Amino acid sequence: MLAKSKTIRVAINGFGRIGRLVFRALLSQKNIEIVAVNDLTHPDTLAHLLKYDSAHGEFKKKVVAKDNTLMIDKKKVLVFSEKDPANLPWAEHNIDIVVESTGRFVSEEGASLHLQAGAKRVIISAPAKQKTIKTVVYNVNHKIINAEDKIISAASCTTNCLAPMVHVLEKNFGILHGTMVTVHAYTADQRLQDAPHSDLRRARAAACNIVPTTTGAAKAIGLVVPEATGKLNGMALRVPVLTGSIVELCVALEKDATVEQINQAMKKAASASFRYCEDEIVSSDIVGSEHGSIFDSKLTNIIEVDGNKLYKVYAWYDNESSYVNQLVRVVNYCAKL
C-alpha cells in the first residue's frame, strides 16, 4: 500500500508521444515527483522533443539535458538508457509507480520486470495482453483497482473515448449489438511514405491517405463495461491529421429511446473525464483537451426502418492529451490507495 500523505515517486519508461505528454502533465501535480525517465534516445534529443511539440506547442519551462539528467527549471530528473526494465534502479530510487509507455512491455511478464527492479506498481499506457491485468477507464470502472493490484492497464485512447458512451447506453437502455468506427489521427505505427509494414494499409503514406485498419477498442470494451462483452466490433480509419479523433458508435438498443433521451442520459453522466458538448465543433477544437471523451450531442441520430431502429452517437478525443489526462487520473487514484 502506498502511503496516502507522502509524495508519490514516479518513473516513466519510454519517452515517446505519450511518455513526454505524461511528463508534462505529471509535472504540475503537487503530490507527484517525477524521479526518472528511461529511454534509449540521447538525453539531448529527449530534451528537445520535450520542449518543442508540433501538436501541443512549446513547453513553457526551461529544459536542459546535462550529465544524464533533464533539468526542468531547477528540478532534476534522472535519465537512464536501459533496454531491460529488470536492470533499472527502481529500488534504489524508491519508485512507487512506473508509467510503462514504450508499448513493448504490455504483458504481465514484461510489466513485472519493473516490479522485479523494485517498483511498487506499474501502469501500462496501452491495452494489456492478458485479461488477468485489470483494464480501467477513469470515471467508468477505475474503482475496481485495489491496493493489491501491482499491474494495471489504462486501456487505449480509443477505449477511453468509447467506454463512457457504451456505459451510459448499456446502463440506461441496454445494448443488443453494434459497431464502432474511430476516425483517428495518424500515428507513428504508420509509414510517412509508402514503405514495408506488416499491415499493408499502414504501409501507405500516412499524411495523404485515409487508411482503414484495426482497432482493439470494440473487443476491449468488455473489460471495462462487462455487460457489453461480445456485443461490439469495430475498425479504424486513420486520417491525415496530427492529432484529434472521433468515435462513431452505431447500436441497436433493448429499450426504445429518442435523441433527446439519449442526449439527456449522456449529459447526466458528464464529468471531468466525459464532456457533454452542444457546440458544432471540429477536430482542431479538441486538440489539447483534458477530457477523455467529448460527447457531440448535435450528431446523435436515429434511423428507423419497419420498426427497427439504429442509434448513432459520436464522441471526440485528442488521442494524445485526452488519453494522457485519463492516465494521470489513474496515477493519482493509485497514489491514494
Curated annotation (Swiss-Prot):
Molecular function per GO: glyceraldehyde-3-phosphate dehydrogenase (NAD+) (phosphorylating) activity; NAD binding; NADP binding
GO biological-process terms attached to the record: glucose metabolic process; glycolytic process; plasminogen activation; protein localization to cell surface
Positions annotated to bind D-glyceraldehyde 3-phosphate: S156, C157, T158, T187, R202, T215, G216, R238
Residues binding NAD(+): R17, I18, D39, K83, S125, N319
Keywords in alphabetical order: Cytoplasm, Glycolysis, NAD, Nucleotide-binding, Oxidoreductase
Pfam families: Gp_dh_C, Gp_dh_N
Subunit structure, interactors included: Homotetramer.
PANTHER family: GLYCERALDEHYDE-3-PHOSPHATE DEHYDROGENASE 2
Similarity annotation: Belongs to the glyceraldehyde-3-phosphate dehydrogenase family.
This protein's name: Glyceraldehyde-3-phosphate dehydrogenase
Biological source species: Mycoplasma pneumoniae (strain ATCC 29342 / M129 / Subtype 1)
Gene designation: gapA
